[in-house]
């Protein structure tokens, strides 16, 4: 996946602490069709011990800047409705809730709603 994203001109960033990975952030097109060529969807993952230190904000700033320079117009975050911290994190960065998809994903043995948040870059 890393090589594919980089070959497509997307960022794939890995954060390290004490020589080990503690977070990653990447993005790709929201949808494959040309009408969505300027709308991206990102993924950000931090280990629990790396949270609350500003690392997530730094990773997001870096991928948003990369996407903006590459011509992206907006960034989408898809967050499980149960992930209140993830939703709050994105809202604090200027993302607005634009949709909720009921029972869109299955995790931990149950169906979960998916929140869609968007930021115009």
Regions picked out by a protein language model, each given a short descriptive name:
Residues 20, 57, 69, 81-100:
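Conserved active-site alpha-helix within GNAT-family acetyltransferase domains
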Residues 1, 63, 86:
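Aromatic/hydrophobic pocket-lining residues that form π-stacking "cages" and hydrophobic walls in ligand
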Residues 1-49, 60, 120-121:
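Acetyl-CoA-dependent GNAT
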